[in-house]
Structures are given as C-alpha cells and as structure tokens.
Amino acid sequence: MKKEISHLIMLLLIVSMLAAGCRRTEPAQTGKGSEELQSEQGKGERKAEDADIITLTSEMVSLEDGFSAVKYTGDYKLDTFLEQGGASSDADVMKFLTKHLFSGKSVLEFFGNLFGCSTLSVQNADGSYLFGRNFDWNTCDALVVSAEPEEGYASISTVNMDFIQAAAGMELERLPDEMKTMAALYAPLDGMNEKGLCVSVNMIEDSASIAQETDKKDITTTTAVRLLLDKAADVDEALELLKEYDLHASMGMMVHFALADTEGNAVAVEYIDNEMVVTDTPVVTNFYLAEGEKHGIGTEQSHTRYEILTKLLKEKKTMDGQDIRDALDSVSKDNFDDPSSTEWSIVFHQGSGEVWYYHRENYEKAYRFKIK
C-alpha cells in the first residue's frame, strides 16, 4: 500500500511571474510619502541586529505560521540540468525533476498566478551595498532555502510554498521534507549568493511574453534565478550567463529581473521582442524601464511604488538595514487599499552575507540568516 501511495504522489510546482498586486485591476494608492516614512524611522529600536542568527539544517523548521526555513547541502543536479540543454517549458523542468530527483515516482505540473514586488539597491555608510525586496501576494506559506551546492556558490533564496502542492489525495504536509526542498530549489523567486549578487524576478502586466528561439540552451524564469545564484559572482557575470541561454517565460508571463552586486551595479534586465535589454536602475517594480515604445507599461500602483522609493533614494544617499526595512514598509501593501499583502520583505546585506526577513508586514520582528 505504501508503495502504491508513493507512486500516486504528485507535486504541483507552480512557477509564477511577478505582477503588481494579485489583481489585474489595482485599487487606489495611498502609499506613504518620504516625510511620513522619516517620521516613523525613529519609532522604537526594533534593531534587527539584536536578533540571533538562525542556524539552519536539513530539517525544515517552522519559524511562525506560514514561514519556514531549511538548508540543503549537496548536489541538486543543476549542472546536469544545464548540460542536458536546460528546459524550454515548465513541463520540461517537470520531466527533469521527475527523472533525476524523484526516481521517476513523482509527476510535476506547473501553473501560474500573479503577484508583485518592489526592489531597491542602495549604499550603506560604510561603503557596502544593501538590496531590499518586497513580495506581494495573497496569504501563503513562505520557505527560506539555504543552498550549498557541491559546485557553485552558496545562497539564500525564497519560495512561495503555495506553488508546491500535493495531489492524489495527499496533503503537502505528508510529503517528505526532502522532496519539498528539492522542488523548492528550482523555484526561487529571489535570493542572494555568497558573492553578494542579488536576484529578483518581477512581473510586468503585458500581453507580450518571452520565448527566445535560437540554438542556445534553454531556461525558464525560476531556473534562471537558480542559475544566477549558483554561477554568477556579479552583475556582469549574470548578464553574460543570461546571454548564453534562450529564456522562456513560465506560463507566458512577461517578467524582468532586478540584479545588484557588491560594487553597486544595479540593473533591470528586460526582454522586448525577445531581445534582452539592460537598464541601469536602483529601483525596480512592475513596469518597463527600458526606453522605447514599451517604456512605462505596467500597473498604476507599480508607478506609485517606484516614485516613492526613487524619492527616498534621492533624499537619503546612504541607508542602513533599518532604513531599507522602513523603505520597504513604505511601499508594502498595507499602505494601499488592496486585499493582498506583502508576504515577505528582505534586506540583503551584500557585503556581510546577512539576510533579514520580515514576515507579513511585521516590521517589528526580524529573522536573521547568514550565508555560510
């Protein structure tokens, strides 16, 4: 019976692209201005650095309702995935994972949903750089994944575990943690590696998509994030890696990447008519930033969030981790008449390898992690 049940297990790995908010029609914007933000920055100590650094193991640990973390050390077959040509579709990723990571016993299916985010890159007073990230969606289960591959850079990334579900009458909680972790390794939505390279995927609400068709190897959106975290030390290396592959947007959704490194390089990578376009920018939300006919296409709320963060960066040339937290708070979903929420906010300390997480807009409580 156990053997029969194991053959019925189905993981549904939902690879989503990022959109501003979870609805196609966004509600009115009431985001905080910079003066209101600055008045709040002095409220309470709320020092994230006072929190203990969380040590992770291969045992998945629940930190609070809807927020867990795990560590994986070893070979999760990324090199094999790339060497065999990558994947030009979510179904192809499914086939690879089924064959190489689940002994052919599991079947993966991929679906898409809409969600949004904001990112910003800024220098600290000590000369190092910080990268902030908000993930906006419905209430979900978030998983922090610390990865230490045999070949590649160590990293910390985040996965929406609502994108991994169990079928055949089994609940996700009953699946082995290692199976869930393996699937999550191929579904990062953001992250930073030991070299300080930060990567985030943001959706652009547009009818166009990305389907590059040349003789290059193929990658999908979240496998591109995993590729960059494992193989790129800085923005230049990340861009060169992306040029080596044909990108295929999962579920046909238009995306752009926000990349930032320890030298202060911060760019948006967009695909217009299947051509990669790179724009220098410290702030990325959910509209096209490249000059041309697509410039500005996106949601109204994403423009509001972009304007708030851009104004903050002009007024405050350097920021520390608390400032980044407050900046992310200023564009979180509780500032808008929006039924969705900011499920997680992250402050990446690119110089030290520290990562601070804030869950569901509770900016009073930080979870500290450190790469290696």
Each language-model region and where it sits:
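N-terminal secretory signal peptides that target proteins for export/translocation
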Residues: 1-3
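Sec-dependent N-terminal signal peptides of Gram-positive bacterial secreted proteins and lipoproteins
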Residues: 5-24
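N-terminal mature-domain region immediately after signal-peptide cleavage
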Residues: 20-226, 230, 320-372
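A short secondary-structure junction signal
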Residues: 143, 210-213, 240, 268-272, ...
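Short N-terminal edge-element motif at the start of the domain
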Residues: 229-232, 237
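Secretory/export targeting leaders with adjacent low-complexity proregions
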Residues: 237-250, 257
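Extended amphipathic alpha-helical segments with heptad-repeat/coiled-coil character used for oligomerization
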Residues: 252-290
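Charge-rich, low-complexity intrinsically disordered segments
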Residues: 284-325
